[in-house]
């Protein structure tokens, strides 16, 4: 029975899920918008929101915690230098999920997940 077990399995083992969400979080921080399936986008919120909250207070310990979750120095630098100050006044809710139809191969529901308060110049990047 799966009573009180939170999070989606997504037909992957735990190490695959952990690596996938680490990579997706890094991509979202780097590009500020990514296209993925709706269930993955909803689970990615649970990974990226605590990272941005962590980036609001810049310390060596917080940078090491962020690096442990993303394994990318560029992403950690952008988190603490750009995203932390940008979302300093916001109390959570840093991401937005926009549904964008279905994938052609298997009709999986697709969505864009993006950071709110994104600069207007980057909206044409995706």
From Swiss-Prot:
An MF annotation (GO) of this entry: structural constituent of ribosome
Pfam families per record: Ribosomal_L17 (PF01196)
Gene3D superfamilies attached to this UniProt entry: Ribosomal protein L17
Any single GO BP term: translation
A single Gene Ontology CC term: cytosolic large ribosomal subunit
UniProt keyword annotations, A-Z: Ribonucleoprotein, Ribosomal protein
SUPFAM superfamilies per UniProt: Prokaryotic ribosomal protein L17
Matches recorded under HAMAP family: Ribosomal_bL17
Complex and partners: Part of the 50S ribosomal subunit. Contacts protein L32.
NCBIfam families the UniProt entry points to: L17
UniProt similarity note: Belongs to the bacterial ribosomal protein bL17 family.
Name this protein carries in UniProt: Large ribosomal subunit protein bL17
Originating organism: Vibrio atlanticus (strain LGP32)
């Amino acid at each position: 029975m799966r009573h009180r077990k939170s999070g989606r399995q997504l037909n992957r083992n735990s190490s695959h899920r952990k690596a996938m969400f680490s990579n997706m979080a890094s991509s979202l921080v780097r590009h500020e918008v990514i296209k993925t399936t709706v269930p993955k986008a909803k689970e990615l919120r649970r990974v990226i929101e605590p990272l941005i909250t962590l980036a609001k207070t810049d310390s060596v310990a917080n940078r090491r915690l962020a690096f442990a979750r993303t394994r990318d120095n560029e992403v950690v630098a952008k988190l603490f230098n750009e995203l932390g100050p940008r979302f300093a006044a916001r109390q959570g809710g840093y991401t937005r999920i926009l549904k964008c139809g279905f994938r052609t191969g298997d009709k999986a529901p697709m969505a864009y997940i993006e950071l709110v308060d994104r600069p207007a110049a980057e909206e044409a990047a995706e």
